[in-house]
């Protein structure tokens, strides 16, 4: 069956308003995470400009804490979720990638908009950098004797700021309720709701999909799950500067699991085009 891919250069909120109600089978997206300046109004030029500044003054993304972030994300995602709720068919799924720190805002927005939170999928990976920072540079600026500084640095040499190395991204699995219909009756009416477990995963391709998706072989327990590596330079493309590119294999897996052949899949946020 030929694949019909259509790309629209538009504000996603405004474009989604033009879609017919109950016309979408699956929404699968990697939205702005609203961490630091990475919100719905973020500028690539502004973000790239900050990277040229000092590492200490301008901390890496995700290390600054602003209580307004979660409120801004919730408000924006509630508006989006309420709009998508009308466009999805009953039993249609809304899958949203997020960060562990702000996942709750996305899940709550989907819930309040009317969706059922059916599950959370964890995409686990090990190719990540530690974010916790040493406090040595702060101690060196403190008003105390050189000897006291040396002693304090030694005492806290193994302590870092409270950012645990992140090795997973959560995916919120929300579903538009099917009302009083059974899943099979809803399936016959809309071709949505039931999951396609025909694809087998794991090392031996003999396991049904789980809610943990890993990037590599950890041990026997993790081997039972679906292994998906982060995309390398070849898959990303030479000119792709997007900071959170998702693997094609991961997106393919989710589309096959949560939709059928011929389904209409919507991604409100283009990102790098995965």
Model regions and ranges:
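Core catalytic lobe of class I
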Residues: 3-274
């Amino acid at each position: 069956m030929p694949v019909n891919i259509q790309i629209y250069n538009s504000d996603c909120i405004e474009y989604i308003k033009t879609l017919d109600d109950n016309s979408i089978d699956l929404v699968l997206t990697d939205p702005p995470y609203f961490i630091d300046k990475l919100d719905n109004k973020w500028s690539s030029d502004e973000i790239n400009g900050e990277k040229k500044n000092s590492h200490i003054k301008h901390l890496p993304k995700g290390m600054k804490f602003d209580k307004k972030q979660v409120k801004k994300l919730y408000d924006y995602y509630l508006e989006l979720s309420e709009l998508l709720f009308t466009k999805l068919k009953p039993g249609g799924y809304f899958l949203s990638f997020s960060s562990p720190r702000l996942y709750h805002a996305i899940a709550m927005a989907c819930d309040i908009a009317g969706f059922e939170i059916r599950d959370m999928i964890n995409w686990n990976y090990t190719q990540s950098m530690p974010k916790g920072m040493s406090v040595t540079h702060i101690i060196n600026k403190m008003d105390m004797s050189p000897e006291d500084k040396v002693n304090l640095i030694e005492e806290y040499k193994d302590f870092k700021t409270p950012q645990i190395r992140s090795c997973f991204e959560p995916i919120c699995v929300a579903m538009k309720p099917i009302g009083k219909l059974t899943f099979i009756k809803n399936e016959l009416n809309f071709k949505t709701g039931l999951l396609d477990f025909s694809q087998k995963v794991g090392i031996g391709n003999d396991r049904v999909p789980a809610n943990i998706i890993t990037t590599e072989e950890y041990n026997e327990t993790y081997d039972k799950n679906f292994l998906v590596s982060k995309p390398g330079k070849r898959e990303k493309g030479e000119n792709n500067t997007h900071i959170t590119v998702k693997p094609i294999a991961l997106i393919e897996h989710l589309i096959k699991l949560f939709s059928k052949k011929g389904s209409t899949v919507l991604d409100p946020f283009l990102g790098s085009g995965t």
